[in-house]
Amino acid sequence: MSRRTYGNTLLLWLKLICCMVKDNSKLFLLVLLGMLTAFGPFVTDMYLPSLPAMGDYFQTASSMVQLGLTTSMIGLAAGQILFGPLSDRYGRRIPLLAAMWLFIVSTILCLFARDIHQFVAFRLVQGIAGAGGIVIARSVAADKYSGKELAKMLAVIGAINGVAPVVAPIIGGVFTEAIGWQGIFGILLGLGVVLLVGSYCFRESLPKEHRSVSRWGDTFRS
């Protein structure tokens, strides 16, 4: 196959991808929502094989390093309480962009943490940001689909959510020996950038007239 043929094929695929992104096609939404669903488990679990190496790096006990897992899971739970009402009030796109930016910044801070205490604190923020993807993915599915289509989309999201916690440590284990724990967080950073780009391409799915006007106090009282 000639270079010209390769070039034409690549150009055709790029045009196809651009059309899917521009129109927010079903395939684009499936990929985006699937990645957002897997985002939280990857944030919490992908670095697990790196725990011993991180203990040596920060010169601390393994129990202290494991606090990073605990705080990220706390953040994952707290973030759902935060991003759920935000996405109902301000739409899906703005909170999603905020979550992605928050994740990117917190991941960079994790990479440059000077001690284990800073790292644990930044992991909490990472978990909060990761929760945004899980909550908003389900909300977008409910906005865009109904009936059997919604059931199929939620089934796919549920399957991904079940598989991701198993796959994430395996992927982390494969890469840990080659690139170290910083490399694992570099992969997470790259994933965050990809999702940020996808979030900018995403069109708002919740019209203003359907948004909630309730106050934060009402949310917690309910």
Feature map (PLM): residue ranges:
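Juxtamembrane intracellular "pre-TM" segments in multi-pass secondary transporters
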Residues: V21, P207-S222
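Residue-level signature of mid-helix packing/kink "hotspots" within the transmembrane helices
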Residues: D45, M73-I81, P165-V166
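Extracytoplasmic
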Residues: F28-S62
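Helix-loop-helix hairpin linking two adjacent transmembrane segments in secondary transporters
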Residues: Q118, A155-Y200
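Cytoplasmic helix-loop-helix junction between adjacent transmembrane helices
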Residues: L124-I160
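Conserved MFS/SLC helix-loop-helix module at the cytosolic interface between two early adjacent transmembrane helices
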Residues: A78-I116
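Short hydrophobic/alpha-helical segments at membrane-entry points of transmembrane helices
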Residues: H117-R123
